[in-house]
């Protein structure tokens, strides 16, 4: 399950992949900007397990590449700052990994290598859907935090994930 907790009085949004939490329901926000994130491999450090998304993509959108920084892993505590929106306008937002993530995809297995634009619209970018972050069996919780959010504004988060596998 995916949960985003934007607690009142806090400028951070924690995205958790373990449990769903009840919280205050915010009014439907007006979308003023979109940010895209490609969680996956840096081809330089993990050849064959996917590639970062080249900007702009075929739809004219810009992506923030959140990639591994230690072999097949993205270390806990890593901060990805200087995030930009889909039009390549800089934002004040940052994303921090609260736990270690493992990368995989492409020839390493499991990613969606031929995304369907009719189903995924702007998310149908093979470099974004073909690799991914995941938790290993020994890990029971992984999360990341968005910071520098405005507590007086609403935020929508959409996540796409896939894995070609016969087991969970």
Locate the predicted segments by residue.
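Extended extracellular/luminal ectodomain segments enriched in beta-structured repeat modules
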Residues: 149-157
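Low-complexity, Gly/Ser/Thr/Pro- and Asn/Asp-enriched, turn/coil-prone segments
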Residues: 3-137
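Short, flexible loop/turn elements at secondary-structure junctions
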Residues: 41-43, 150, 163
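Short proline/glycine-enriched turn/loop motifs at strand-loop junctions of beta-rich domains
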Residues: 10, 152, 163-165
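Short, surface-exposed beta-strand/strand-loop-strand elements in extracellular ectodomains
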Residues: 144-146, 161-168
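Short tyrosine-centred short linear motifs in exposed loops/low-complexity segments
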Residues: 1-2, 153
């Amino acid at each position: 399950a995916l949960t985003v907790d934007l607690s009142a009085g806090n400028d951070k949004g924690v995205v958790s992949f373990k449990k769903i939490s009840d919280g205050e329901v915010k009014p439907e926000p007006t979308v003023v900007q979109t940010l895209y994130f490609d969680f996956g491999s840096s081809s330089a450090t993990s050849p064959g397990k996917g590639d970062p998304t080249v900007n702009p993509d075929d739809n004219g959108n810009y992506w923030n590449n959140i990639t591994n920084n230690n072999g097949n892993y993205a270390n806990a505590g890593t901060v990805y700052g200087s995030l930009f929106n889909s039009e390549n306008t800089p934002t004040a937002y940052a994303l921090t990994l609260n736990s270690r993530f493992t990368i995989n995809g492409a020839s390493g297995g499991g990613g969606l290598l031929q995304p369907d634009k009719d189903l995924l619209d702007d998310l149908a970018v093979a470099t974004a859907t073909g690799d991914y972050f995941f938790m290993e069996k020994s890990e029971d919780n992984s999360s990341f935090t968005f910071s520098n959010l405005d507590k007086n504004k609403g935020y929508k988060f959409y996540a796409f994930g896939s894995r070609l596998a016969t087991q969970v």
